[in-house]
Amino acid sequence: MSKSKVENDIVEKQKIISSLTLMDDLFMKVVLQDKECTEYILQTIMGDSTLKLKRQSLQKNLSNLHGHSLVLDCLCEDGNNNIYNIEIQNNISGAEPKRARYHAGLMDMHYLNKGNHFSQLPKSYVIFITANDVLHGKLQIYHIERTIQESGKPFWDESHIIYFNTSYVDNSPLGKLAEDFHAKETEQMNSDILSKRVALLKNAKPNEKGGKEMNVLLENYRKKALKEGIEKGIEKGIEKGREEEYIAKQKVIQLMGLLAEHGRIDDIKKSSIDQEYLQSLLLEFGL
């Protein structure tokens, strides 16, 4: 690889890294490798500054031999044996109520061992951190729990679902956390804990610990972009069943690969929802 090529790659990688926020799920998983960051986020959402975690697992696979398995963004347990599933959701489809229900159900299945009584189920929280107000209630946070309709009293099954709407920013602790989730620059962040971790990752040299983590992250972004491009192209090609449509989708696949190689992650995201922008990129690359 020529020197100019190496230099260009470094510049492109730095552009990607600079554009990342906590709402980028892959970046968030790297940030949460520091358990103190997970604790701070939970403390703020739960309104409990004393909350401490015993353990956490990122990209935790919850298998289901008889149905749909899940890979959880973050699964953790506090000192009182309460369990939390934290999910970063940028798309409405990823934060549907029935998805939250399924997460809670599969967590219960994995935390109740054979022979144990149901009373031994831990208190559980499924927390969706969303980019938009997916429940359309114009609220910053939503707490969902079962109630007895006839009396209006709580049904104490200790299963909780929380939606944290990060599009709502104000001067409250939750509002400041929401602002931090969308900040590209550490100087814009309110939390010292989060900003310190983000700065370490974004400013680290390639041979340093944070730099190595970011190299893995960028490779995962490349693989994800290629996979999404291929799946999208194949799906559309099969649906249409026409040769010209198939050829067009092959061009989209090729485009996604080129964009990934050039580190243009924002263009991949935008082209997936903007058809005119997709066409302009195809022209740019002569496809």
Q: Where do the protein language model's features map onto the residues?
A:
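Short, charged alpha-helical interaction segments and adjacent helix-coil junctions
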Residues: S2-S18, L22, L26, I45, ...
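Short hydrophobic beta-strand segments that form the core of ligand-binding sensory/regulatory domains
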Residues: Y163
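Accessory alpha/beta interaction modules
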Residues: M1-H160, D170-S172, N220, E228, ...
